């Protein structure tokens, strides 16, 4: 069986194995106080064009999401996010478990717009009895979204302005950051994210690392006691240098960006094959996740050779499925899938 079900079904890019092997004889202090984490943070600061952000390395993305929210909010504040947001649908109530309410907003192709956030914030601040409500304080979005779509620079700028107007934090989940940056339609850079957000992260687990996410704290207000929140929530890895080594290895020569861009290009080949067969897209994605609508017969035929993800069933019985390429997907695997799509 050929896997197109996710972007974390191989361990790590070969350059990471080579770096780990070369470093095997060395030893380091624990908990991120090592030279690899320092070097990785320096690489990230070069990429974002700023020296002032604080950078912390997490083992996983769910940990990054709930620690950021826990550290940013007090007990009467809440998170605003798309209805389809990862923290709302795929994290087992981790945000709610920190004691914070999620205010979900209707999403269009996985995104929420500045006007929606404005309406949410203004309804709170203009409410006659706001003391009986939670204050919407942090806006959570992801880049790319759960459906592989991406925010334009203009959309991010508008969200940034609204957040500043109402004193809200803008938090960008970047678990698939490489695939978003590598999309052919993308006009957002890491430097833009460092200017427009209060906190964001560069994902490693889904983008070539064995594990790990690099959280970039831009807003000074979020830095105080942040590592204490990490430790309190089990997010500080004792062997922290393994995180730093991986990020330094992937970022120092652009490997992170080249391998994720290739996965996007492979996904577009799959997208085009479905187009040729007049099979409808569910969302207009230009990243490594492609969502299409298949008949039961088409789904059964492809599932004989490929593993892909069922996202939902439409009222007429057709299936919404996801085909996901990754940094480890081979051209041969894509060639086979394209041929079988065209043979449907």
Describe the function of each predicted region.
Residues 151-183:
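Catalytic PLP-binding core of fold-type I/II PLP enzymes
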Residues 99-144, 151-158:
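PLP-dependent aminotransferase-class I/II
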Residues 102-103, 170-172, 281-282, 309:
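Hydrophobic beta-strand scaffold residues
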Residues 14-61, 83-88, 94:
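Conserved N-terminal alpha-helix of the aminotransferase class I/II PLP-enzyme fold
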Residues 71-89, 118:
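Conserved PLP-anchoring active-site segment centered on the Schiff-base-forming lysine
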Residues 75-76, 268, 273-342:
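Conserved C-terminal alpha-helix-loop-beta "cap" of PLP-dependent enzymes
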């Amino acid at each position: 069986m050929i896997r197109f079900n996710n972007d974390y079904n191989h361990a790590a890019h070969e350059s990471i194995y080579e770096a780990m092997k070369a470093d095997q004889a060395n030893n380091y202090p624990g908990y991120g106080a090592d030279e690899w984490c320092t070097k990785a943070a320096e690489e990230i600061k070069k990429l974002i064009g700023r020296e002032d952000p604080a950078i912390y390395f997490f083992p996983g993305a769910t940990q990054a999401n709930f620690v950021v929210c826990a550290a940013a909010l007090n007990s009467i504040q809440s998170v605003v996010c798309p209805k389809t947001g990862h923290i709302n649908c795929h994290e087992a109530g981790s945000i709610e478990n920190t004691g914070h309410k999620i205010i979900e907003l209707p999403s269009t192709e996985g995104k929420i717009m500045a006007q929606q956030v404005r309406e949410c914030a203004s309804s709170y601040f203009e409410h006659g009895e706001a003391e009986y409500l939670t204050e919407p304080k942090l806006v959570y979005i992801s880049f790319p979204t759960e459906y592989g779509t991406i925010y334009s620079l203009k959309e991010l700028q508008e969200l940034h302005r609204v957040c500043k107007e109402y004193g809200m934090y803008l938090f960008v989940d970047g678990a698939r950051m490489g695939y978003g940056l590598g999309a052919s339609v993308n006009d957002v850079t890491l430097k833009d994210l460092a200017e427009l957000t209060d906190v964001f992260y560069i994902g490693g687990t889904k983008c070539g690392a064995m594990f790990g996410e690099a959280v970039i704290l831009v807003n000074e207000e979020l830095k105080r006691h942040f590592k204490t929140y990490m430790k309190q929530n089990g997010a500080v890895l004792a062997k922290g240098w393994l995180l730093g080594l991986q990020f330094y290895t992937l970022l120092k020569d652009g490997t992170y960006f080249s391998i994720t861009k290739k996965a996007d290009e492979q996904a577009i080949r799959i997208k085009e094959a479905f187009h040729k067969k007049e099979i409808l897209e569910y969302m207009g994605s230009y990243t490594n996740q492609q969502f299409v609508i298949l008949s039961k017969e088409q789904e059964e035929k492809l599932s004989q050779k490929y593993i892909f993800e069922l996202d939902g069933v439409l009222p007429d019985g057709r299936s919404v499925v996801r085909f996901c390429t990754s940094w480890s997907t081979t051209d041969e695997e894509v060639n086979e899938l394209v041929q079988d799509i065209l043979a449907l």
